[in-house]
Structure formats: structure tokens, C-alpha cells
Amino acid sequence: MADSAELKQMVMSLRVSELQVLLGYAGRNKHGRKHELLTKALHLLKAGCSPAVQMKIKELYRRRFPQKIMTPADLSIPNVHSSPMPPTLSPSTIPQLTYDGHPASSPLLPVSLLGPKHELELPHLTSALHPVHPDIKLQKLPFYDLLDELIKPTSLASDNSQRFRETCFAFALTPQQVQQISSSMDISGTKCDFTVQVQLRFCLSETSCPQEDHFPPNLCVKVNTKPCSLPGYLPPTKNGVEPKRPSRPINITSLVRLSTTVPNTIVVSWTAEIGRTYSMAVYLVKQLSSTVLLQRLRAKGIRNPDHSRALIKEKLTADPDSEIATTSLRVSLLCPLGKMRLTIPCRALTCSHLQCFDATLYIQMNEKKPTWVCPVCDKKAPYEHLIIDGLFMEILKYCTDCDEIQFKEDGSWAPMRSKKEVQEVTASYNGVDGCLSSTLEHQVASHNQSSNKNKKVEVIDLTIDSSSDEEEEEPPAKRTCPSLSPTSPLSNKGILSLPHQASPVSRTPSLPAVDTSYINTSLIQDYRHPFHMTPMPYDLQGLDFFPFLSGDNQHYNTSLLAAAAAAVSDDQDLLHSSRFFPYTSSQMFLDQLSAGGSTSLPATNGSSSGSNSSLVSSNSLRESHGHGVASRSSADTASIFGIIPDIISLD
């Protein structure tokens, strides 16, 4: 009962943030005002909470009200330099006290050397809620060799109950350490660099495994009252998310006093997080280059090729329960990082794939930005787990003209060549294979011709370069319409051929024959003057010009038209259609009238007007062209000039 009352009193003294942590830990709703959160926490306690929740309440209460191990009266120092030191701060006890009030494993400088500022800060020391030197180990950095520990991993702790906290540390250098740092100075560049460095690192206070570098939130570091530059903030991935710094070791060598008599102080300020504690450590390290790491990797030796062959056989072993079996594996000899041929093929022991990457490029990239992630499977591939594959070293030695290989079930390998390379190799043997294939083709063709002449057998030569199939074939010759072929006679389809009489479909009344005795034959001969004109262009021969003409009936001089049609030679085949171009003044359209054969113009009449129309018989045109006006009969002349008074458009 007393225990529950004590827990209730602890819950009543918690703040909003601590109540939210408690309710969230218990799986309850943690939203609301303080009195609502307090009511929920009391109901949780009244309902009988688990021992884990009770421990959480006590932990939150201890953080809320830390117990003091020293009081200001105990650590009052009226004048360190003039008055005797109190018994509690005797010289024998000072070396075991650090600035956060915890015993230290390494002796530190007396308090009088810290100055009056830190003497006034001594009363505000924290309690022993966290171990000063917990069993914390930080991950080993491949590019740094550890020379010494200046400050062992120590928890960041402060008696300040506020969110922003601050604590101070101090360390001193030995003469040997000062000499190591001074002798490693490199002033060749614009900056003064040191290969032996003083390195500050932060991590989480966890002992389960070696810890990675992890900065506390809102970290600020001052070394000897000078601000220390930290890595820049990373851009947030989402809106409203607080930006964070990339956690890396901090080089504070340029801010350290290289002296054996003057100590170095480090003031760390950060923002406290509920449920998380941090630790810091200071090391003396030596920086290494990628060349040194590559030499060390080679010194480890090359892995036996049989290990890789066993892995290949394991991957290609058929699973009896699976319907799909892998029969081969294709692996590239190009590095996935630089897309260049591998020189030192390596991969991590933790990787399950066979694909390797180049060790030189991998180490150089991590020297600029240490991530140590496998470029093939995106898993962690630390330097300590890298191995050089002996099987790939053999492949690179014997396969110099190929960038891809294929592993088989027995662990053997074969180069994978492109189609063009394979075709070039097979083309060199076409001298023998071509003769055999041509002989075989000839024998098959002769045998089929003797047995069945009507049946053709197509023999395909597989040794011919396939690139010829990809070439564009010449388009087949365009077929000429039989009705428009120059050698074929013009079709009479859709054309009405009439003798020397009036058309039965003509709407004009029959006219009596005109006496042509009074017409002088020399006059007609004048109209037979040949027109020497160039033929009509081919691209204009099939065009229909009637839509561009007006729909009214157009009358032309029939005598001139008939004479022009009779004068055109028979070898001009420019009129490919049965339409009549109603132009008399243009030489282009007069050429269209030179169509040969027995075709006739279709009978037409005006659609809108009531004018009379008639047809021109091609027979009369043929007679007038083939023989002459002098040999014509009077009836022929009358049929041309008397019966057909005018010609109208089809449209």
C-alpha cells in the first residue's frame, strides 16, 4: 500500500512531457491537457500496472528530481589560492574528481588550474545516475589508427533539469603526444593539416555492440573557449522535420594547446532527450590514406577460388520442391561503381552475391564520404569484412577480351560474347561452310526440279550474316494499272462510241446534214497544222481539273477542236482517263486529246442550263487523224461539223 502511495506521489510530480512518455510506454493515449494526462496515469496506476510500468515511473521520477551527492556548502571554496583547502578537497582527493563530479580513471589537473569560471561551476555537479566510464566501445574507423585515449567514453550528464544542458571536460597531453602531433604537421597546402590528430567522438550510451558516431541534438562544442566547427546540416527529407547533422568524428587538433603544462578544456552543450543518453570520448589517432588501406587489404591475401566455386554450385543446385531451376549465372567483369573493368575484385563476407566491385574505387569513395555500403546489394560492407575473390582474379587474367561471363552448374565459367562478335567469329569459317551450303543448296534445287518442276524449294543459309536481314529491302516496283498502261489498249468501259449519227441519248433534236460542198479543203488543211509541244508532266497526268471549273456550260469552237484532235500523233498516250478537258486555248489540255484506241467521250449534258449538247465520236477523230480531210467523205465532214455544234463540260 505504501508502495502504491509512493508511486502515486511520483506520478503527481511528473510534468507533461514525462506523463506523455509514461502513457506512451504503457500503450495509452498520450494526447490532452496536463490534468487529462494525469487522470489517465492515475487510472493506469489504480488499475494495477505491470512491474515494467512501475520501473518506468521510478525512472522518470529520478530524472525529474536527481539526488545531490554534494551540496554547495560542501564544495564552497572561498579563495582557492589564499586560504587552505577544505578537507573535502584535499590534494589526495582532487585527482579522482572530474568536472561532472564523478571519479575518473586517469588523473586530472587540480581544480585551481581551471580558473575561477569553472570553480564557480563546481557546485552544480550531477549525481551518479549514469556511469562515468561505462563499458562503451565505439566502432573502429578504417582510416584512423588509434594511438591513445585522452578521455575514455564518458556519459554526458548534468544536474541542470532544463532541456538545454552543458558539461565540461579536461585533458592534458604528454611530451610524447605533443611531439607526435607536432612532427606530423603538413603545411604544403593552404591549410595546416596533421596526420596525427586529436579526435572527438560522440555516441549513444549503449553497451550491446560497438557504437557508431551519433551526435546529441543541438550539439555545440567549445575547445579552449573557441567554438569548434561541426559537419553541416543535412537537408530535411520532409517538411517540418528538424534538420540533423551527419555524425562524424570531429578533428579538434587545430584548437588544442600543444603544451604539457597547460590543460585543454572541452565544453559540450546539447539538448536532453527523454529515454536517450549520450557519451563522448577523445582519442589520439593517426590518419591513413586509401593507398595504405589497399595495401593492407592485399596483405590479407586472396581468398581461395574454391570458396567461390562452392558458392556457385550451391546457388545452381536444383531445388526439388521448386518448379523453376537456375541453370547458369551471368556476372559482369565491370565495376558497378566506375563502370570500368575490375582490377582488384572484392566483396564483403556478408554479401551473398557473386558480383564483385573494384576495391580501389570502393576505398577511395569511402575516403571522401564514409558510408561503407555494398554497391551491389546496398548492405553494410565494412572494410574489415572485405575479401579479394581469387576466382575472379583468375577470370580477369585469362579473359581479357570479354566483359561478361557465365557460370555453369559445375562451377566452370565461359565468356559471354555479343551477337556481333559471335557472327564475326563464325564468318571466318564461311569459306568452308559456304561451299558446303552452296553445294547442298544446288543438289536440293536440282533434285526438286527433276522431281517436281512446278514446286519451288527455298533453301535458307544460316551462315549468312544476320545483319543483311536488317537491311532495308528495296521497295517493289509499282504496278501499272492495265487501263493506263501505254502498251495496252484503252478500255471502253464507261465510254459510249457512236457512229455517224445523232446520239440516241442526246437531248438535242436531230439536225439535217450540212452540205460541205461549199467548204474549201485547203481551209481544213490549215487546221491540221501539227502542234509540236512537250508532253504533259507525269505528276499532272492523273489530276482532275474539273472541280476547279465553274458549273456553267462552256461552248467552244468545234471545228478548231476537231482539227486539233486530228493533228496529234498516235504515239502520245497522255490521256489516261476518259474525261474531256474543255480547254481550247491551252496547249497542255490539247495534248490530252491525243488518246488512241477506239475510246469515245461520254455523253454529257448541262445539269443546270437547258442548252443543247451532243457527243463527239472517237471514230470520226480517228478517221480524221489517220487519213486526212481530202479523203474524207462529205458525210464524215458533216458528222463532225454539222451534227456536233458544241461541247459541254461533264460537271
UniProtKB/Swiss-Prot annotation:
Which residues, renumbered to this chain, carry the PTM Phosphoserine?
S467, S468, S483, S485, S488, S491, S503, S510, S522
Pathway(s) this gene product operates in, as recorded in its UniProt entry:
Protein modification; protein sumoylation
Record's Gene Ontology CC terms? cytoskeleton; glutamatergic synapse; nuclear periphery; nuclear speck; nucleoplasm; nucleus; PML body; postsynaptic cytosol
Q: Show where the record puts the motif Nuclear localization signal.
A: 56-64, 368-380
Give UniProt keywords alphabetically.
Acetylation, Cytoplasm, Cytoskeleton, DNA-binding, Isopeptide bond, Metal-binding, Nucleus, Phosphoprotein, Repeat, Transcription, Transcription regulation, Transferase, Ubl conjugation, Ubl conjugation pathway, Zinc, Zinc-finger
- The UniProt annotation puts the region (Required for interaction with MSX1) at 2-200
Q: Which GO terms describe its molecular function?
A: DNA-binding transcription factor binding; protein domain specific binding; SUMO ligase activity; SUMO transferase activity; transcription cis-regulatory region binding; transcription corepressor activity; ubiquitin protein ligase binding; zinc ion binding
Zn-finger (SP-RING-type) intervals are 320-405
Q: Name one GO biological process term.
A: negative regulation of transcription by RNA polymerase II
PINIT domain location is 124-288
Q: Where is this region: SUMO1-binding?
A: 462-473
Domain SAP positions: 11-45
Motif (LXXLL motif) positions are: 19-23
- According to the record, where are the sequence repeats? 520-523, 557-560, 598-601, 612-615
Q: Which family does it belong to?
A: Belongs to the PIAS family.
Q: What is known of its domains?
A: The LXXLL motif is a transcriptional coregulator signature.
Record's protein name: E3 SUMO-protein ligase PIAS1
Whose protein is this, by species? Mus musculus
